[in-house]
């Protein structure tokens, strides 16, 4: 397979210096929606730049339960969103197959729930175009042995699991392949205006404080809940509803199918398998805007998630909790609902020229991870209409990088080639692009992260080609540090490789401390039993043996 650098001008996602060139479109936000919008714009021939204040997936995209929604959860309360979800579900299975696992899903009815609700649920699913098969409890237990054996009813739906980190990275790569420029760690601090038109953005480099300006004909605000602040900088207002959702990650994959509670949407009503773990969630609590960058999972939320999660699968009662985390849903407020659950998950695409008299500014928000591609299509359609460009959207047909047809698939089916465990793991993460991971020596085959089977060769590939500048970036691209030991044994190895590549943007000892503190931040709310033992050993290893606290006493979690 030819080297990446020979197939295009540059796949390396580089920072840019001050520029006076004008783009057709500036996309603000490096989550799935922003990455998808940059991809769509670039594929339609627009001169595109994407700007992200931190790293890709640092916001809500990297803080969800990784559900490939069938839309069934919304069939009763939000049929429009349900129909969007099932349509996008089928598209993502085609274009993002290396990001998707077809687990199937169960909606279970427990003795305290109502079978009448199940009957209505099935009818609502069918109306939305979602396949919903009623199963007897025995069949449900046969399909998913981890499900609560006390269930009195079950419905099978086409749910699945999707990795938001891989999905976003693939969209970024596709955008770059089609000519887009990418800027990370660049925060929008203001806009350049010409009367009632936005014609550029003012940026501050979060690493060195350097300021710059990027000019564009149209700017797309794809910042999720942070879009509220970006809109205010532009002089307009969006009434966003910050709804916090807390989740727990368990150290083992106890279930192979997604398990949902068949009742009206409530806290802790879903258990999603993913890679080597499973995730239970979520809660829904309105929080102030000043907390969206500093969310904490409370003991009460942990207790609730564990208590209700055990009702989905009793095996969770004896399974170690790895960590807790929370994300913020980018909902557009429409009423005074105290939980935000009645607010539509539908897509909101705002043309601020029509709404506020501000030309050259578009906001795409609402929706969810499942509908990111459709959101990007709607935003790009609007941008193209403003620029007089008449090119159709092709993102539903053209596979993402890593999901293209691969000759190795057939060879493996015919047992012509066999892969090692780490090669299979890398293929699961990078799809057909795992062929770009070059192992030139036995040293390249050595494992950096034993929990997730991440090799030196894969780390080298990620550092060189996937815009990695610190350990947190590396975690999002490879799953290094996301396994049972939470970076205990692999973080120092990864830091050494970053230093060797001269890609670490801060002293490697500080980067290592920041990474371990970021891991600690998620472990602290569930720090008892086996997790407490693990934390104590990690602390002894890094502080007592490596002297990390002496070298970097002020280190805090940082991007």
Tell what function each PLM region has:
Residues 42-62:
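Glycine-rich FAD pyrophosphate-binding loop
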Residues 164, 174, 239-246, 252-254, ...:
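C-terminal catalytic lobe of FAD-dependent flavoproteins
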Residues 5, 108-178, 183-184, 190-197, ...:
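Flavin (FAD/FMN) cofactor-binding and adjacent substrate-gating region
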Residues 221-235:
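Flavin (primarily FAD) binding-site architecture
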Residues 1-25, 40-44:
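Extreme N-terminal leader/targeting segments of oxidoreductases
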Residues 66-143, 269, 410-419, 534, ...:
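Dinucleotide-binding Rossmann-like beta1-alpha1 core, especially the glycine-rich loop
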Residues 21-23, 209-218:
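Core beta-strand elements of the Rossmann-like FAD/NAD(P) dinucleotide-binding domain
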Residues 25-49:
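N-terminal Rossmann-like FAD-binding beta1-loop-alpha1 element of flavoenzymes
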